[in-house]
């Protein structure tokens, strides 16, 4: 039985065949609560990743994990796959930004793991469910933390002669205590394809207080 919240195939493109159940969760698409005081959002599983940021950005907040498919992927699917993105370097993947879930277990029991605070008491069943690809239960509600948007974001594009040099540079930056908000590496072929298509690319962003940005 596959019960991913998005009722879709995963990144490996496996498809349901015989003796399985495919659950369409598309109508679970509402944001239930935005709690700015506790900096969290309670949402149904088929709200898209990017929709969470859109819902809170007017108040100066955002949801950090950003898979490349964030415009379409569901938050329930993110939990099922423990999704991450460019900004996972600093802010972690879904598991680092997930506070709680409501889930229907295989025997029909409806239960909650976690809540509105990190490190809820008891066993880490929330961690067990995260990344389980929908095999342990059906997620019906998700609570995630939101972060205050940085005052200023600056981007840098840096060229290196080799992939090794690029990796060493990132390691040295982090070793000096400066963790980029996001970082991507592109080889020669990908850089050429990007430039041919868009004439521009973004590799590095770093959020900082306004008075610390050059």
Where are each of the predicted segments found?
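Single conserved hydrophobic/aromatic residue that forms the stacking wall/gate
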Residues: 1-8, 12, 204-214
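Glycine-rich N-terminal segment of FAD-binding domains in flavoprotein oxidoreductases
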Residues: 6-28
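Residue-level "edge-of-site" marker
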Residues: 9, 68-69, 186, 211
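Short secondary-structure capping/turn micro-motifs that flank functional sites
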Residues: 10, 72-73, 189-190
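Short Asp/Glu-rich motifs
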Residues: 13, 75-76, 192-193
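Short, hinge-like loop/turn segments at secondary-structure boundaries
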Residues: 18-22, 82-83, 200-201
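FAD-binding subdomain of flavoenzyme oxidoreductases
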Residues: 29-184
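Terminal amphipathic helices with adjacent charged low-complexity linkers/tails
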Residues: 186, 190-206
């Amino acid at each position: 039985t596959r019960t991913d919240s998005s009722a879709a195939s995963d990144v490996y493109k496996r498809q349901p065949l015989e003796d399985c159940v495919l659950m369409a969760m598309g109508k679970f698409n509402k944001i239930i609560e935005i709690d700015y005081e506790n900096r969290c959002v309670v949402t149904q599983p088929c709200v898209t990743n990017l929709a969470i940021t859109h819902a809170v950005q007017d108040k100066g907040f955002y949801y950090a994990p950003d898979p490349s498919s964030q415009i379409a992927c569901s938050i329930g699917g993110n939990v099922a796959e423990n999704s991450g993105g460019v900004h996972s370097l600093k802010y972690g993947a879904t598991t680092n930004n997930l506070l709680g879930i409501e889930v229907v277990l295989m025997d029909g029991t409806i239960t909650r793991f976690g809540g509105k605070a990190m490190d809820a008491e008891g066993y880490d069943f929330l961690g067990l469910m995260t990344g389980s690809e929908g095999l342990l239960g059906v997620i019906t509600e998700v609570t995630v933390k939101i972060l205050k948007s940085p005052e200023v974001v600056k981007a840098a594009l840096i060229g290196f002669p080799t992939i090794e040099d690029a990796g060493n540079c990132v390691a040295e930056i982090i070793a000096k205590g400066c963790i980029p908000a996001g970082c991507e590496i592109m080889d020669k072929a990908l850089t050429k394809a990007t430039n041919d298509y868009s004439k521009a690319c973004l590799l590095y962003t770093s959020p900082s207080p306004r008075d610390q940005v050059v």
